[in-house]
């Protein structure tokens, strides 16, 4: 990573998610330089033109251009959004075979440039592909991050806020585990303005446990619902990627539920999975190990096991 004030972000993959991420970066003034790389040169160049035309309205001047892998050499963050798309009825894990092949080529090209920054992975299945990026790149684990369950956590907080009638930033809770079908809500730590959700259920009979079960189902299945209606999800994940990017560039040491590598935390080893982590200029420098209840521990173990079973045919895992 360059020891200078100019932050360069390279976006690989200018599809729905990548383009939305680029727009969010510029609209929020998060990066100084933005390089877009895509196999479809015309699409990427069109995005560059479109984004540059709105530069007069941006809060911060962002130099934006269509580039090549050579531009990764001076990059601080390379965000990978390239890969096969999730189709209706297809799980994120169904995409493994297709996207592992794509990623091996992409990561090889990036590393050949001399890149020494932070990888931010968005392509699904994100936990698997973040692990693959770590293996293919050879970078330290803290400098390879996936979007993980940051969006799931945001969805959770939004739906909690709607249910309890408060602002989203006053609804606190985490979704952890696989970004997918085995993710879990950490109800034992969920609270509204500091009041545990479990206490609110006891205090007011209008709040019901079955409502909260349905609420989580809506979190877990949100992507499927959106894909059914509009074909793809991209705004929410782009905003979560921008949030992670901002935390890195501003060295916020923000706690975000990214896909991070576990080395004994939560009783798991050698897996990338969505957990709260301290994110700053060095990447995901520390895992925040929550005190889970027994049910949550078992659910998390199951989620990690599902990911390891997918990884095992492709990588030699540590015990």
Swiss-Prot record:
EC numbers listed for it are 1.1.1.27
Write out the pathway annotation from the protein's UniProt entry.
Fermentation; pyruvate fermentation to lactate; (S)-lactate from pyruvate: step 1/1
Residues that, per the record, bind beta-D-fructose 1,6-bisphosphate: 157, 172
User: Active site at which residues?
Assistant: 179
Phosphotyrosine PTM positions read 224
**One cellular component term from this protein's GO annotations in UniProt:** cytoplasm
Q: Does the keyword Oxidoreductase apply?
A: yes
Show the InterPro entries listed in the entry: L-lactate/malate_DH, L-lactate_DH, L-lactate_DH_AS, Lactate/malate_DH_C, Lactate/malate_DH_N, Lactate_DH/Glyco_Ohase_4_C, NAD(P)-bd_dom_sf
Q: Which CDD domains match?
A: HicDH_like
Regulation of this protein's activity per its record: Allosterically activated by fructose 1,6-bisphosphate (FBP).
Give its localization.
Cytoplasm
Q: Where does NAD(+) bind?
A: 17, 38, 43, 69, 83-84, 122-124, 147
> What is the enzyme's class at the highest EC level?
oxidoreductase
- Please name the Gene3D superfamilies in this protein's record: Lactate dehydrogenase/glycoside hydrolase, family 4, C-terminal, NAD(P)-binding Rossmann-like Domain
Q: Which processes are annotated in GO (biological process)?
A: glycolytic process; lactate metabolic process
Check the record and name the PROSITE patterns matching this protein.
L_LDH
Entries under PANTHER family matching the protein: L-2-HYDROXYCARBOXYLATE DEHYDROGENASE (NAD(P)(+)), L-LACTATE DEHYDROGENASE
Q: How does it assemble?
A: Homotetramer.
Question: What is the stated purpose of this protein?
Answer: Catalyzes the conversion of lactate to pyruvate.
What's the protein called, per UniProt? L-lactate dehydrogenase
Q: What is the lineage of its organism?
A: Bacteria, Bacillati, Bacillota, Bacilli, Bacillales
Identify the gene encoding this protein. ldh
